[in-house]
Amino acid sequence: MKLTCMVIVAVLLLTACQLITADDSRGTQKHRTLRSKTKLSMSTRCKAAGKPCSRIAYNCCTGSCRSGKCG
């Protein structure tokens, strides 16, 4: 019985620590869009500025497809 109570208290304590840590780090990541664009360009083959592109198959390294060309 005592061991069960100790395990329950330990799990609750660890869960509380996880939630506090997650709440503390919210909003501290800077340059989120820059990081995601860099990740995208590293993980997929993308087209350079001025190359033809499709808005359906989004594949520009610059992050925008305007008038059928990467910009």
UniProtKB/Swiss-Prot annotation:
InterPro entries found in the cross-reference section: Conotoxin (IPR004214), Conotoxin_omega-typ_CS (IPR012321)
Keyword DNA damage among UniProt keywords: no
Residues annotated as transmembrane: none
Keywords for the protein's UniProt record, in alphabetical order: Amidation, Calcium channel impairing toxin, Disulfide bond, Ion channel impairing toxin, Knottin, Neurotoxin, Presynaptic neurotoxin, Secreted, Signal, Toxin, Voltage-gated calcium channel impairing toxin
GO molecular function: calcium channel regulator activity; ion channel inhibitor activity; toxin activity
Disulfide bonds: C46-C61, C53-C65, C60-C70
GO cellular component terms attached to this protein's record: extracellular region; host cell presynaptic membrane
Positions where Cysteine amide occurs in the chain: C70
Site annotation Important for calcium channel binding: residues: Y58
Keyword Chaperone: no
Cell compartments where the protein resides: Secreted
Superkingdom classification of source: Eukaryota
Pro-peptide positions on chain: 23-45
Signal sequence interval, chain numbering: 1-22
Tissue-specific expression: Expressed by the venom duct.
Role summary: Omega-conotoxins act at presynaptic membranes, they bind and block voltage-gated calcium channels (Cav). This peptide selectively targets Cav2.2/CACNA1B (IC(50)=160 nM) voltage-gated calcium channels. When tested in mammals, this toxin displays an analgesic potency similar to MVIIA in a range of acute and chronic pain models in rodents, but has less adverse effects (tremor, diminution of spontaneous locomotor activity and bad coordinated locomotion) compared with identical dosages of MVIIA injected intrathecally.
Additional remarks: Negative results: has no effect on R-type calcium currents, voltage-gated sodium currents, delayed rectifier potassium currents and transient outward potassium currents.
Family membership noted in the UniProt record: Belongs to the conotoxin O1 superfamily.
Domain observations: The presence of a 'disulfide through disulfide knot' structurally defines this protein as a knottin.
Name of protein: Omega-conotoxin SO-3
Organism: Conus striatus
Phylogenetic classification of the source organism: Eukaryota, Metazoa, Spiralia, Lophotrochozoa, Mollusca
